[in-house]
């Protein structure tokens, strides 16, 4: 997860007229009997709570949707597209042991979704893994990981942490822990929120990729802050809006958030990947797929 979700803006998103999809049957019925659209001054926080918690009504709504990105073949496709942006490969299972400092202020970035020492998710991963597997090869670095959390510092991590990470990445239990943390923090909340918003498979991937890159945060540059701004521009399909118009608005807000942090940033994972799929009308994210990220072309037949 990149620091944009945590540090671009420390203030919460607050607006006088923002919108959040709520289950059908509430005041203000939506088009076609789906979720309605409701005004809220804290839509980002409410959306985050809704995506990360369980309610019987939301569970029924999500269960009524097609599997979408949660279908095994589509989930595999999602990991491949994500890996093309995170690690310039489609072979995402070869990236458990990847670790580097990209010089972006996030400290070390590692593993299958780019867990970062500076953005808390790598610390949370190692803490959870150590609870289940005490004495693992990364456990001794927990004090240092806690100290550097929120910074780009390597203090207490060098020189051995990168080698320890690569070694632990050969352990099946740590690979499973990375996948479980990916699903818990990023994949499952993103897909759930997308289904509550009435989005199809492409929209679910758009949410997932943004959740990984921007973090599950409600600041203007975090996932829920980006979603909130997009909903103000174009209502969600679940609230009666058009799916393509909403996704275009979401991607535009996300692109602006990236450029607000770094005006020279490469936005190709948005422009020549997700936007390409959208403008081709591929709302179900069906193969064959061709896209470009960071100047490299990828294809899935």
Q: Where in this protein do the model-derived segments appear?
A:
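Cell-wall polysaccharide-cleaving catalytic domain and substrate-binding groove, primarily
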Residues: 2-169, 177-197, 202-301
């Amino acid at each position: 997860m990149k620091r944009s979700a945590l540090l671009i803006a420390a203030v919460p998103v607050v607006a006088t007229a923002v919108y959040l999809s709520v289950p059908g049957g509430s005041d203000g019925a939506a088009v076609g009997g789906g979720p309605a659209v409701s005004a809220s001054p804290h839509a980002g926080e409410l959306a985050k709570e809704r995506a990360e918690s369980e309610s019987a009504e939301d569970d029924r709504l999500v269960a009524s949707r097609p599997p979408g990105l949660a279908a095994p073949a589509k989930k595999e496709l999602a990991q491949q597209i994500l890996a093309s942006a995170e690690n310039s490969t489609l072979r995402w299972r070869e990236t458990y042991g990847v670790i580097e400092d990209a010089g972006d202020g996030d400290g070390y970035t590692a593993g299958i979704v780019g867990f970062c020492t500076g953005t808390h998710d790598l610390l949370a991963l190692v803490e959870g893994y150590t609870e289940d597997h005490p004495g693992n090869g990364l456990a001794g670095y927990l004090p240092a990981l806690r100290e550097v959390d929120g910074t780009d510092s390597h203090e207490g991590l060098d020189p051995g942490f990168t080698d320890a990470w690569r070694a632990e990445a050969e352990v099946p239990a740590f690979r499973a822990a990375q996948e479980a943390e990916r699903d818990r923090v990023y994949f499952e909340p993103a897909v759930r929120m997308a289904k509550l918003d009435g989005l199809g498979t492409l929209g679910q991937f758009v949410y997932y990729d943004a959740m990984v890159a921007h973090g599950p945060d409600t600041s203007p540059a975090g996932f829920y802050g980006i979603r909130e701004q997009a909903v103000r521009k174009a209502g969600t399909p679940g609230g009666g809006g058009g799916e393509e118009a909403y996704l275009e608005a979401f991607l535009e807000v996300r692109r602006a958030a990236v450029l607000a942090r770094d005006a020279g940033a490469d936005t190709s994972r948005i422009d020549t990947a997700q936007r390409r799929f959208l403008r081709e009308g591929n709302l179900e994210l069906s193969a064959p797929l061709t896209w470009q990220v960071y100047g490299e072309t990828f294809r899935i037949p």
